[in-house]
Every structure is written in C-alpha cells, then in structure tokens.
Amino acid sequence: MTAGRAVRVWVDITNSPHAVIFRPLIARLEARGHEVTVTAREYAQTLGLLERFGIPHLTVGAHGGGGIAGKARAAGGRTAALARLARRERFDLAVAHGSTDQPPAARLAGIPQVTMFDYEFATAMHHWNGRWASGVLVPDAIPEEALARYGMRPPKLRRYPGLKEEYYLADHRPDPGLAAELGLSPSAVVAVLRPPPEVTLYHRGIANDLFAATLDQISQAQVEAQVVVLPRTAEQRAALQGRPVIVPERPVDGPSLIEAADLVVSAGGTMNREAAALGVPAYTPFAGRLGAVDRRLIEEGRLRRLERPEDVELAPRERGARPGMRDPELILDAILDVANGATR
C-alpha cells in the first residue's frame, strides 16, 4: 500500500468491547479518505452497540456457545463466509482485535491482515492467529519473548506504548443522557460491575464465585449506593432478576458509564483498562493468569487485585481533569505500517 493512497479496509468485530475500540478508528480512517467495511458477529452487545453508534455493518455468524465443538462449527462456517465476502469485495487490508475468524479468511482471500490483542495467555487464539496474521499489534507491556512461541516476532510483531484504551478514548465524549437513562442519583456511590465471561476459552475450568460475593457485598453496603451490572449473556441477565441492581435494557456506551461511576469491578480486561485510562478506581477479580498489561497497571496503582469482597472501597471518587491520553493517529499509522511491511 502506497502512503497517501486511499485503501479499502475491512474491520471484523466479534465482541462488545471491539465496537468501542474501533468506533473512533473507523471515523479517523474515513476522515483520511479510506473506505471501511465492518463485519460483526452476533454476540453479547456487539450488534446493539454498533447500532447505537450508527456504524453500518454486515452481520456474519454468531458465537458458538460454551462448548469447544460448538465454537469450532461456528468458527468454520463464519470463516468460510468471511473468505467469500473478502474475495468478492477485494479489500486492501483487514484488521481485527482478537478475531479468530478474520485472519484465516483474509489469508484465503490474499489480503494482508493485522491482528491486535493485549492479553498474551489466550494460547489457542494466539497459536491460531500467529499462523495466519500478516502483522500483530500489541502494547509494549507485553515482552517480545512472551509471543515468540506463537510465531509472533518482529517485523511481524509491532508494539505500541501505553494502553490501547489511551488511544481510542482520546476522542471520547461522555453521553450526557446516560445517567438519566439509567436513573443514576448524583448523591449515590455508583459501582459498575461486569461479570466473568463464562464462555471464554481462557476462563474454562476457572470458577469466579468472588464476583458474586462482591456483588452481594456492595448491594448490602450501609451507604447510599447504586450498582449497575452489565451482563454478557441472557443467562447472566436472567440470574440478576430480583436483585437490587440496575441492568440496562439496551446496550450502553461503556466509557460513558465508567466516567459516571465511582468504581468499576470487572472480571474481564477491557472495562478495567478503560477505567484505568479514565482515572476511575478499578478492581479485577479475574481468576486466571494476569497478563503483562494488568500486572503493569497493578504495579502503577491504577488497577487493584480483588481477593476478598471487603477489598472494595465503596466511596465517592475524586473527579477532576482526565489523565493524559495518546494520539490515535499513531495506532492508525501502526496498523497501516504493519500491513505495508507484512511478512506473509
């Protein structure tokens, strides 16, 4: 790809956080004159967020559920469908964050593909994507030697400084109507909780009763508090019925909710890192192996490891200026540079 030439970029979005990640990047790509096509998988709040953000997209496939066989069937069918689409559309570049469907589909269609991630221990995903991707983009907290076993080495591997959240949140403006939509009280301590992703492969076999205990602890606290829970699945939503919590009826803009909150407890990674980037106290009850990004945040005091429900400090947070953000153009340049110098 020649610098300055308009290209056709294909973005694949397979999970709710990816809609937030790519929202500003898509806008900036289009502002540069590039044409962007978005494909999406039906899973969690992915499609709802894309609709809320006004991002046109093609829905291709759905999540395969919690079983390995179901995941394999869904992935095979979706990869084949994406490869057919890519051949027909003749994209110049493909990019995704954590998609295991796009890398092989792009390779089959002869399109350079950039894969992004920020958790190095999703071994099945990385062995797979490391084989198919043309380029890999990760935070510099992850050492090169941790990725070599996946076939991810320079020049295929490119690392960027800081958190990805510090880039894509640079343009973010909070939704002014969100507090009223959810019925949040300005006098209450607002806690946002995100349950563990029970169907995710790297959580398989790991129990997280700590999350449920923490939810009970906060709900029963002797202070004026409101708890907003963002379930990942219909089963999680059903399990929350009857509890004294707020469960949004439709997908919400996560960063806007975080900025309205006093603290965040998330068993996944993205919401905690968004909180860290926005200066909001964040706790992780993640029961698996912590990745390098979260370890760095804990060392810096920007993320706290939750070991007991009592560890949560339920108090109003200090509100002031946002922490410093980073220039999203650097991420766009890195994506295009990885594609330009891709080793196939």
What role is predicted for each listed range?
Residues 114-116, 126-138, 258:
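A conserved, positively charged/aromatic
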Residues 137-206:
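A nucleotide-sugar donor-handling region in carbohydrate enzymes
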